[in-house]
Amino acid sequence: MKHADLISQMTLEEKVAFCSGSDYWHTASIERLGIPSILWSDGPHGIRNSVGTHDKDEPKKKDKKGEGMDALLGGIPAVCYPTAATTACSWDPELIYGMGELLGEECISEKVSVLLGPGTNMKRSPLCGRNFEYFSEDPYLAGKMSAAFINGVQSKGIGTSLKHYAVNSQETRRMTVSAVVDERTLREIYLTAYEIAVKESQPWTIMCMYNRLNGVYGAENKWLLTDVLRHDFGFEGMIVTDWGAENDRVLGLLAGQNLEMPTSNGDGNRKIYDAVKRGEISEDFLDEMVDGVVDVIMRAKEVLADGKGYNAGEHHAAARKIARESMVLLKNDDNILPLSKKAKVAVIGQMAKKPRHQGAGSSLVNSIKIDSAYNTMFEAGIDVIYADGYAMTKKEKKNSPETYIADAVEAAKKADVAVLFIGLTDEFESEGFDRTHLRIPPEHVALLSAIRGVTENIVVVLAGGAVVEMPWIGETKALLNSYLGGEASGSAVTDILFGDVNPSGKLAETYPFSLEDTPCYNNFPGHTATVEYREGLYIGYRYYDTAKKNVLFPFGFGLSYTTFEYSDLKVSADSIKDTDTLKVSFKIKNTGDRDGAEVAELYVAQENSTIFRPEKELKGFKKVFLKAGEEKEVEIELSKRAFAFYDVDLGDWHVETDNYKILVGASSRDIRLEGSVKVESTVDAPVKDLRETMPAYYSADVMNVPDDQFKALLGHEIPESEIHDYPNLTFANTLEDSACGKNGAKLCKMLRKFVGSEGMACSIALQTPVKNFVSMSMGVFSEELGRQLLDILNDKKPMGRGILVLIGKAIPAVVKGLPNLLKNI
């Protein structure tokens, strides 16, 4: 232990106090031992410190957000950087490292010790409401970007919390659903990004997920937290729950989870204390868990004492640079872009003035300054004609859509080119709920169609944090995907549209033609009890490329205002052992007349695999800046893992002796160079041929995998997919689980009427376990009230007037507060 001297001076009560937060955002402290309380804060692309820089024991000053639970929704003004979905498209770890440094400086200024991020979950389905917070569908790219982010933040002496470890790929029933996943898929897809981040950056903390993995909650999954994370990956830091993710405090601690957040008002501490007294937990083991918490506190203590400020203007400028290097040019017919600064431009769409620059939920930042594309064009002297194009607010939506469209059409008629700002709104994607389709608002599509009726010179700037369908793409000459570009997204868009910056972003996820094309279409978001990952390894381009499925835009795709030529591929050897390192080199030349940057992508494909594998997998990449006419040589090294698959029987990564193609290109579908190397295995282990038992996985025909093949993949029976707990519901059940009962149906109907029938509030109210109503209500909803509620939900007690009055005092506060509270998760 690192802090045995301090821990030896603690009482048992003091030790267990360090196993949970002292409130929503702080850890415990012991003044006599010089152990301060530290502050945690969201989030991955900007500080969302709802507490501020006041001392923990001082009362918080009132602000416009008020006090109590609603106060948690607020946040200090901070720089809002592009979201992970955006920055991943930069394919530039150095850029993300720099962003991490800036966030670290801001944490120091606000006395934040641990920043909750990055989010490293895999984009299994484009429907996931939180995809804007995650990097990629590819674990190698996500892992490299995560490691860069972590190293950047922690270089300033501030901790990070890599989240949400590890199989948390949906918002529907995110607190209770069990992800049913085979071990090979876990190791190769859902755990690899975390493994890379841990081995290359050692985050101070890792946040475990809410949901269950193969029946076991993430917060108490010993295999996941100890066997894999600590033993296999070599994680040395502290494990913290997601806010409110604790299910059984004693099991969580024994599984290797150090800290429960937020405070459990002493309940979790009492359970640990009693377990120690019973001998269920040894005090030596408790000391080790406490040591992990104390270590994080003491590492941050010295830096926070400096209390240095930061230059908000410089950080805003950096956010602009990050945004413009991450945005992706998807279409540019007739080289309509870049636009002439002398052109008369119709700027259409309210997003041009009110950019959707970030997502909704726990990552929501109170941006210091927001650049709009309209203002930055106007300030640059561009001749601009503006039209709203569509309604944004409820009040505006009472007006006729035709009125907005008519004004926009008139503006387009007077201009040389029409630039339309359209995309996903907060109502269409957010933390707390998943999308049910991939469409953008219909009024945006109608607007584009109307403008196309009067001009063919149309440029679309698409905003949003996730993949969308584009049956309308033929209506526009150019398409710039700005994703969610942070507070400087507007100026970054202007920089690209008018050629001050050459776009260099490339997609970190595949854009299919339709939702029905996605590999997990029939298995997302799953059932009431489970979600089955029947597609196995085949997510994203691994599926589309192997199944030869046509896509709208492939993984790794992105255009530039210049052109690049690849040549002279060399491999350091024709044959290597799996213990050797292979060096791959090639040249890239800028053959256009503009300076620009190209992302070179390296994929590996096994030629004659016995085990089923994706057609090819990303194993290296490099972003290279080249002046017009310049040529550079790129070198990428490949080690054993670039050729290996995870052998479940062997319990290790294994390379099958075979020839492997080395593929270098501009996207997964645009391979420019090809080489080959023979790799010889140094481990004498047979590779199973599973074609007879799992043929669907050899052909990537995974849309409808039969039960027998999925069972064979899992290596065990397929778990029951539906919840049948009524009338024996427990604190782990949700209100939605009671809907089949008489009282539960009434209560669910009442709540839908109270919070609305869809969106974040409805999802949270109905899909939050009763235990979280207790733990997250700041004492408003007591455990006793929870028991009484369960009696009602189980139809053991009538919904009489007296109990309704009692519950009625708490339910509104909890339901109103939960969306705000859970936005802090």
Question: PLM features: residue spans?
Answer:
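Surface-exposed polar/charged interaction patches
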Residues: H716, F754-S757, D795
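N-terminal, non-catalytic alpha-helical interaction modules of very large eukaryotic scaffold proteins
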Residues: A739, N743, C748, V755-G759
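Conserved catalytic region of serine esterases and O-acyltransferases that act on ester linkages
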Residues: I576, T581, V683-V702, A765, ...
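C-terminal non-catalytic accessory extensions
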Residues: A761-I825
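Terminal connector regions
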Residues: K640-P686
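Charged, amphipathic alpha-helical linkers/stalks
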Residues: G675-N743
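Glycoside hydrolase catalytic-domain context in secreted enzymes
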Residues: M1-F643, N659-L663, S668, M778-G779, ...
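Short amphipathic alpha-helical segments that mediate assembly, nucleic-acid/protein binding
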Residues: H3, L12, G744-L747, G786
